[in-house]
């Protein structure tokens, strides 16, 4: 075993991912560092089995006995990553492709609200399943029906079941699916890279228990249950590491990110998510699952190599990590078609369209279609969106905002002599908190009061006095028109304007709004 760091590096972080995987993160590396570590392992009898490079990324895979070593170097960020896996199966990976008999296709399984379940039919009639969704009877039944209906064989063959990360809405379907349908399908391989079930040091949320469920859905309980089901199927299990390339039927798959790359920077389970670049049917599909682009530094590590025809929108469009990094990624990916694993309601009315990164994607000129999960949808590869669907997407965005209220509300005919005229009710029906700017106008211009701010929590109804303690009347560092500086004139008429960063419903017990406007 080599001692790492071996060449006097000042910054080296070591993490134990689970019982069989260790990862070393070396900063301020260069091309020579990559070559030196390859030579170091080769010098102690490791055999280099694979090596490739792109303009800003180098990868090498070495083996010795049952141990595998995977080395990645990213020149733009000057980071070297070394992963050592005991009992490694990567080098014995074999996939036997059958006769090409059908067109490849992707089915986004119907979702109750959100989750992730994809069935990818290969050209030989076998399937790649990504995640599967919740361990709910409808989720597993819809997945099985899709496999059964689209398979050219009487018994569907799952060439690979890929599990992206340990969250209830992604992998737990596998447990119930095996319990119900193990005898009616053949599962050849399972692919994943999960932490240990009790790794609360790195991932405290593994013990999270959701009060909405009567069953124990915590990962501490369900990761072992999932592993037991894998053994029950007899499927070969592979631990995926960044840089590895797999040929599954006629699908070429490359792992761009996994827990290897984020264990040292985030305790967020979503950050461990697999990112897989798949080439199938003459197109490139980027599966980002729930990855946070900023945690994984995907734009910096891969640049234009991220370009894809079809993008599965990360984290259901809910955003994970910084929006700015997501937007940089979308500018590099430039997808024409997006798969968004949420219902129309969550996508356009309740959540996604109000996230900065997802809103940017919805307005990107290159995006011709966003396919949500309200209905089950199958696309045959290569797939090109119809010309009219972009217009329909824009109409859904606009309708979603209208359904939530307006961005600007104006009330007139109020009087400072009436205490109740300062009391308003605000309804925020989105899943994100809203900021409201409030302005008061009087007949005398110099009395105007500006930049009163109020925060309205997500999915909530709030009644507030706009000049009371529940509103911030002096929100700016310097506000010459602040409530505190000017005060309220006595016994004069006034008007109030609400400017909302989310669509909002503003009401008053005794007055109707004089004006409300929607901006989109």
Tell what function each PLM region has.
Residues 47-68:
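Ser/Thr-rich, low-complexity intrinsically disordered terminal regions
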Residues 125-128, 137-195, 301-318, 334-338:
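Active-site metal-binding motif and surrounding structural segment of the metallo-beta-lactamase
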Residues 114, 136-137, 166-172, 197-200, ...:
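Active-site environment of divalent metal-dependent phosphoester hydrolases
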Residues 95, 184, 189-191, 197-254, ...:
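Binuclear metal-ion centers of metallo-dependent hydrolases, dominated by the metallo-beta-lactamase
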Residues 28-50:
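Amphipathic alpha-helical segments
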Residues 396-520:
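Gly/Pro-rich, tryptophan- and cysteine-flecked surface segments typical
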Residues 1-24:
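Compositionally biased P/S/T/G-rich terminal and signal peptide-adjacent segments
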Residues 88-156, 231-307, 377-397:
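Core dinuclear metal-dependent hydrolase active-site scaffold
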């Amino acid at each position: 075993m080599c001692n790492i760091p071996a060449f006097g590096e000042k910054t080296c972080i070591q993490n134990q991912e689970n019982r069989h995987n260790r990862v070393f993160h070396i900063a301020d590396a260069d091309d020579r560092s990559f070559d030196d570590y390859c030579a170091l392992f080769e010098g102690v009898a490791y055999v280099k089995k694979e090596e490739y490079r792109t303009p800003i990324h180098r990868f090498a895979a070495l083996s010795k006995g049952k141990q595998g070593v995977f080395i990645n170097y990213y020149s733009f960020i000057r980071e070297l990553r070394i992963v050592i896996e005991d009992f490694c199966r990567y080098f014995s990976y074999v996939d036997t492709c059958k006769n090409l008999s059908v067109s490849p296709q992707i089915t986004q399984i119907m979702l109750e609200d959100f989750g992730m379940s994809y069935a990818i039919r290969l050209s030989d009639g076998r399937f790649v399943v990504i995640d599967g969704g919740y361990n709910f009877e409808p989720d597993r039944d819809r997945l099985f029906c899709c496999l059964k209906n689209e398979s050219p064989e009487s018994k569907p063959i799952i060439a690979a079941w890929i599990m992206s990360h340990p969250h209830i809405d992604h992998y737990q379907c596998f447990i119930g699916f095996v319990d119900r349908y193990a005898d009616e399908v053949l599962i050849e391989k399972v692919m994943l890279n999960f932490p240990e079930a009790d790794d609360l040091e790195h991932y405290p949320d593994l013990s999270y228990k959701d009060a909405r469920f009567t069953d124990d859905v915590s990962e501490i309980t369900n990761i072992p249950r999932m592993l037991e089901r894998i053994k029950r199927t007899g499927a070969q299990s592979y631990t995926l590491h960044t840089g590895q390339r797999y040929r599954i039927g006629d699908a070429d798959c490359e792992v761009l990110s996994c827990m290897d790359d984020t264990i040292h920077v985030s305790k967020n389970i979503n950050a461990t998510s697999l990112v897989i670049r798949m080439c199938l049917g003459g197109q490139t599909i980027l599966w980002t699952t729930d990855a946070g682009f900023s945690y994984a530094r995907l734009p910096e590590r891969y640049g234009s190599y991220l370009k894809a025809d079809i993008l599965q929108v990360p984290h259901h469009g809910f955003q994970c990590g910084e929006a700015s990094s997501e937007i940089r990624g979308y500018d590099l990916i430039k997808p024409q078609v997006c798969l968004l694993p949420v219902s129309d309601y969550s996508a356009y009315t309740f959540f996604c369209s109000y996230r900065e990164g997802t809103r940017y994607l919805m307005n990107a000129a290159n995006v011709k279609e966003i396919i949500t999960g309200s209905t089950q949808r199958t696309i045959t590869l290569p797939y090109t969106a119809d010309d009219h669907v972009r217009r329909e997407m824009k109409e859904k965005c606009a309708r979603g905002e209208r359904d939530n209220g307006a961005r600007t509300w104006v009330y007139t005919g109020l009087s400072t002599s009436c205490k109740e005229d300062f009391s308003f009710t605000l309804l925020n029906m989105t899943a994100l908190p809203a900021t409201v700017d409030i302005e008061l106008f009087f007949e005398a211009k110099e009395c105007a009061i500006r930049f009163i701010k109020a925060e309205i929590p997500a999915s909530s109804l709030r009644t507030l006095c706009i000049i009371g303690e529940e509103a911030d009347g002096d929100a700016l560092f310097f506000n010459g028109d602040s409530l505190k500086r000017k005060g309220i004139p006595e016994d004069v008429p006034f008007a109030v304007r609400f400017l909302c960063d989310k669509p909002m419903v503003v009401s008053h017990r005794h007055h109707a709004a004089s004006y409300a406007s929607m901006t989109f």
